[in-house]
Amino acid sequence: MNPVFVYPQSRFESAALIDLRSGEERARLSPSALQGFFNIVQRWQLKNDEARELLGSVSSSTYCEIKKNPTNTLDVDRITRVSYLIGIYKALHVLYGDPLADQWVKMPNTNMLFSGHSPLELMTQGGIVAMQQVKTLLDSSRSGL
């Protein structure tokens, strides 16, 4: 016999899942995602090459096109990357004050995850998986783990 788990009913409605396979959903989310991304690029004082790597090694011409026309629809990979970066940015600003929160990504870090490298180096080299690891680390710090 399998145990049955009963959870109390929440008074909050669960958020609807967003289907990123849908072009309409990506078109709806992309402008605000890109606005957030370029704000982060500015706050973190990233070079174009670093920003391009965070978006998934896009070419210079593609990056310039995205920058000129931030209403372009992002593909699933890029919108996922931007989502992680926004989460990282938010977590940093919860954990630290403004100057440190924006400098943290470029600072060498002794945490085992970074091995003395900066979080930015890890994320540009490790892509989405590294972004997920950085976000998980920061979320754990926020919750006191």
Residue ranges of predicted features:
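Non-transmembrane "mature" sequence context
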Residues: 1-145
